[in-house]
């Protein structure tokens, strides 16, 4: 029997016009948007799904980076945005957003993925404007550049 996340993912694939997307054996589904943004969905449990935006490798050579990430995380939390987290296996910074499955629709899922994407863009640009670059083979600063972006926003 399919989980609520699987049923939603099937409807989402149909809505966006892709043949089929599904969760792997680790209950993850990953895809790129516009060949720039790398998104993973996790079938966490039957109550909610997690949406992850892969921001890039955690730069260990910048002493201000950890403090800036804590500042960004507080700002996102205060404004209802995704949370920043660290994935140790890939040594990567992620944006994570919990997506409740009650009353979930493909449109709502698409909107929340958009929140994560916009938040990724914003985080990347703010860090870039402070001289911090995340190593990310998918997200290219020249594709989303803005010279005056100095403040975070939650993407909503």
From Swiss-Prot:
GO cellular component, one term: cytoplasm
InterPro entries registered for this protein in UniProt: Tir_chaperone
Keyword terms, alphabetized: Chaperone, Cytoplasm, Virulence
Subcellular location(s) of the protein: Cytoplasm
A Pfam family recorded for this sequence: CesT
GO biological process: protein secretion by the type III secretion system
Top-level taxon in the UniProt lineage: Bacteria
Residue ranges of the TM segments: none
Function statement: Chaperone for the type III secretion of Tir. Probably stabilizes the protein, prevents inappropriate protein-proteininteractions and aids in secretion.
Family to which the UniProt record says this protein belongs: Belongs to the CesT/SycH chaperone family.
Official protein name in the record: Tir chaperone
Organism: Escherichia coli O127:H6 (strain E2348/69 / EPEC)
Gene: cesT
